[in-house]
Curated annotation (Swiss-Prot):
Changing T162C: No significant effects on inosine uptake. It comes from Crithidia fasciculata. GO terms for molecular function: nucleoside transmembrane transporter activity. Changing M145C: No significant effects on inosine uptake. It is found in: Cell membrane. It holds the Pfam family Nucleoside_tran. This is Nucleoside transporter 2.
Amino acid sequence: MTTSSDSAMVNHTPSPWYKFGFKSFAEFNTYVTFVFLGMSIMMVASAVTSAPDFLTRYYVYATGDPDAVAETPLFWNNANTFYNAGTYVLQVLTELFSLTPFMRRIPLSVRLFVGLGIPFAELLLIIIVPAATIKSQHGAIAVIMVVACVGGFSKALCDSCTNALVGPFPTKFMNGAQWGLTVIALLMSIIQIILKVSMGTSFHDILTMSRIYFGICIGIQLFAIFELAILRFNPFAQKYIAEYRAGAQRNAQNNESTLEETAPSMNEPAAGDIADLPATVDDKERALNEEEGDEVRAVTSEEFHVKRGAVLTATGDADKMVDLDQTGNITSTEQLLRASAASVFKRVYPMLVCVFLIYFTSLLTFPGVFFLVSTTSGWYMTVIVTLFNAGDFISRMVLMFRPLRPSPKVVVAGTLGRLIIIPFLVLCVRGIIRGEALPYVLITLLGLTNGYFGCMACIHCPRTTTLRYAGERSLAAMLSGISIMLGLCFGSNLSLAITLTH
C-alpha cells in the first residue's frame, strides 16, 4: 500500500432528517451497541448509587433483621463513599495495566466479554445474600467491598475496551458511548423513584424492590452482550474495527477457496484485491480492502516530533479523515501495539487534564459532600442523585448536535469555571445557607457541566486531526478513560476523607 497524504476526504451525502444522520440500519445498530456498552460500564455502580437507602441499610437486609442497629455506623453512614472509593481504586490500577503490551495483545472482544460477564456475579451476590441472610454485619460490609472491588475490575475492562473500539469511529459514536454512561444512571434513578412511590417502605417491600431493580439491570446487561455478539457481523462496524474486519476477510477468503475448488471457472477477486474495484468506491472503502505493507504501517519517527498540546490548535474535521492503518489485513491488537502512548499523550494532554479535573470535582462533592447537607426530607438523597443524573443526561444529549459542541479551548474555560460550585456548597454544608433549594440548584449545575464539558473533553481526545492512525485514536480514548478514573478515584477518596472528618 502507498499513500501520499496523512488523510483523505470522505464523501458524506446528507441523509434525510428523519434518519437522524444514520445512512443504514447497520450504522444505527452500531450506535445502539456503543450506547449499551456505555451503559454496561456504569451498570452496577449506577444501580447501587441510585438506591442510596438500600446500600446504607444493607446490613438490615443482609442479616434479615428488620430491627438491626448498625454496629459500624462510620461505614454505613458513608457506605456510598466507601463503595465508590473501592471501585475507583481498582479500576484505575486495571486501566493503567491495560496500556501495557501484555494487555494490548489480548483481543479486545475477549477482554470485553469478560468485563460484561462479571457484573452478573455482582448483581446476583447483592440479591442472593439478603435471600440467604448472613449472621454478621461485618459479612455485609465484606459483600459491599467485594462487589466494589470486583466491579472496579469489570468496569475497567469494559471502559478500556469500549474506548479502544469506539476511538476510530466518527464523533457521534464516541458521544453515544459517553451518553450511555449517563442513560443508565438516569434510568436507574427513575426506576428507583417509581418503585419507591408505588410500593411501601416495609422490610419485605424494600427487598422486593431491590430484586425488581437489580433484575432489570441483569436484563439490560444481557442485551448489551447480545449487541456486542452480533457487532462482529455488522458491515459498518467492520470498516472501523480492524479485529472484526480481519475476521470477516478471512471468512470471505475461506469461502472463496471453497468455491474455487468446486467451480474452477469462477474468478471472483479475493478480499484485499483492489485491482478490480470500481472507480466510484471512495477512499475509505478502498483503504479498507488494501493489503497492509509493514514499511508503510510503522509510525515514522518524524511523527513523534509533534507540538505539545496540539489538540488546542488543531484545525479540520477528524470525521473526514481516513486513518492510515485502517487496512484490510491488520487487527486491532496490531494497531494498538504499533501506536505510541507517549506520543498520543503529548498531543492531547490538555483534554486529559480537563477530563481529570471535571470528574475529580464531581466525585469530590457528589454524592458524599452533598449528603452532608442538614435536611429532614426523606427524599433528599434520592432527589440529589436524580438531579445530577438528569443534568448529566441532558447535557450529553445536547452534544449530539454538532453546532453545540464546544471547542477544546471552551472546554478548558468551562472546566475551570465550574469550580465556583464548591464554595457555595461549603456554605450549605456549614449551615450558613439553609434549606434544600440551593443544593438542588448546585447539583443540577454540577450534572450539566459534568456531562457537557466532561463528555466533550473525552471526545476531543481521539477525534482530533493531530492523530492519524486508528491505533492512536484507540489509545487516546483509553487515556481519556484513565483520566476519568483517576479523577473519580482521587475525588472519591478525598470526599471520603472529608465526610469522615466532618
